[in-house]
Each structure stands twice: as structure tokens, then as C-alpha cells.
């Protein structure tokens, strides 16, 4: 049952980003990103990452609601264009859905989906004492490794988000 839930969440995840890529109006693009982010958090939760799923949900979606609330307020149209009002946009949306459907059919026919990355040998990132007894969460270990070993990744990500907000505000202010 859990496999089917993850499969359905994955399909909704891809459909939301097909909707983002063929967005006719900024309102629907933001809606597609919010749905995709929420479903992505659901996929993380289904694999046991409760802490990471909650953090992504709070930080990513909280930040996106602020940014897209501001940008859609700046770029609001009286009659926003929807997916079915333009044949090219509707065709791109349907084409994306057909391609996704064909990929799903191919994956179901072949019976296997190969893992692209192997994460063997990465257990030496965090050294902890095993002398005591207790519960040790792997998620907190991963977050600690991200902030200790991946500090440049965090800095670049923060700078990219800041520049993205500045670019979005400049684009919406100019129109």
C-alpha cells in the first residue's frame, strides 16, 4: 500500500511541475510550486524523514508563500490566463502529461527502476560514542553533516535564494 501512495505522490509531484513549466499566469505557477513542494514533503515523510519533511515544509513553503504572495500581488491581472485559454499552453501541458505517462508505462513494463546514485561508505561523516544506550536519529546526523561539511553549499544556496528574490522583485516591478 505504501508503494502505491509514493507512486501516486510522485505522479502528482511531476504533474505539478509540468503545470509550473507551462504556466499561463504567475498565480498558477506559484500554485503548482506549492503543490509540488507539499507533495515532495509527503514523499520525504513516506520514506521516514519526518524531521526533514517538516523542515522543508516549514521553510520552503513558508518562504514561497511570502515570495509568491508578493509577486502575484505585483503582477495581478484582472482576467488571468488559464491553461485552457491558450492552445499552445494547453498543448504543452498535455504533451508533458503524455510524456510522463509513457515513462510510467515503460517503468511498469520493464519491472524495475535503477538507482542512479549509490551512497555506500558515507557513514564516516559523523563520529558518535556508542558506549551509552539511547535513540539516535539519522536525520539530525544528516542535518549536522550538511551544516558542518557542506557549509559552502548552505552559503551558496542562501545567496542564490536572495538573488532570486531580488530578480523576481525587479521583473515584477518593471511590468
Swiss-Prot record:
Subcellular localization(s) per the UniProt record: Mitochondrion inner membrane
Quaternary structure annotation from Swiss-Prot or TrEMBL: Core subunit of respiratory chain NADH dehydrogenase (Complex I) which is composed of 45 different subunits.
GO BP: mitochondrial electron transport, NADH to ubiquinone; mitochondrial respiratory chain complex I assembly
Top-level enzyme category: translocase
Similarity comment: family membership: Belongs to the complex I subunit 6 family.
Keyword Heme among UniProt keywords: no
Transmembrane segments: 1-21, 25-45, 47-67, 88-108, 149-169
Function: Core subunit of the mitochondrial membrane respiratory chain NADH dehydrogenase (Complex I) which catalyzes electron transfer from NADH through the respiratory chain, using ubiquinone as an electron acceptor. Essential for the catalytic activity and assembly of complex I.
Keywords for the protein's UniProt record, in alphabetical order: Electron transport, Membrane, Mitochondrion, Mitochondrion inner membrane, NAD, Respiratory chain, Translocase, Transmembrane, Transmembrane helix, Transport, Ubiquinone
EC number(s) from the headed UniProt entry: 7.1.1.2
Domain of life of the source: Eukaryota
Pfam name, any one: Oxidored_q3
Name of the molecule in the record: NADH-ubiquinone oxidoreductase chain 6
One GO term describing the cellular component: mitochondrial inner membrane
Catalytic function, reaction form: a ubiquinone + NADH + 5 H(+)(in) = a ubiquinol + NAD(+) + 4 H(+)(out)
Recorded GO MF terms: NADH dehydrogenase (ubiquinone) activity
InterPro entries: ComplexI_Subunit6, NADH_UbQ/plastoQ_OxRdtase_su6, Nuo/plastoQ_OxRdtase_6_NuoJ
Recorded topology in the membrane: Multi-pass membrane protein
Amino acid at each position: 500500500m505504501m508503494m502505491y501512495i509514493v507512486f501516486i505522490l510522485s505522479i502528482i509531484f511531476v504533474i505539478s511541475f509540468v503545470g509550473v513549466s507551462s504556466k499561463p499566469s504567475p498565480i498558477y505557477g506559484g500554485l503548482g510550486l506549492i503543490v509540488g513542494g507539499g507533495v515532495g514533503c509527503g514523499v520525504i515523510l513516506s520514506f521516514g524523514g519526518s524531521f526533514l519533511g517538516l523542515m522543508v515544509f516549514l521553510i520552503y513553503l513558508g518562504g514561497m508563500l511570502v515570495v509568491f504572495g508578493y509577486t502575484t500581488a505585483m503582477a495581478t491581472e484582472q482576467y488571468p490566463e488559464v491553461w485552457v485559454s491558450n492552445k499552445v499552453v494547453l498543448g504543452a501541458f498535455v504533451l508533458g502529461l503524455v510524456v510522463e505517462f509513457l515513462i510510467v508505462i515503460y517503468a511498469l513494463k520493464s519491472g524495475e527502476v535503477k538507482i542512479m546514485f549509490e551512497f555506500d561508505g558515507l557513514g564516516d561523516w559523523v563520529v558518535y560514542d556508542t558506549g551509552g544506550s539511547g535513540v539516535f536519529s539519522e536525520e539530525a546526523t544528516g542535518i549536522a553533516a550538511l551544516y558542518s561539511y557542506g557549509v559552502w553549499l548552505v552559503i551558496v544556496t542562501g545567496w542564490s535564494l536572495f538573488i532570486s528574490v531580488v530578480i523576481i522583485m525587479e521583473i515584477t516591478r518593471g511590468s
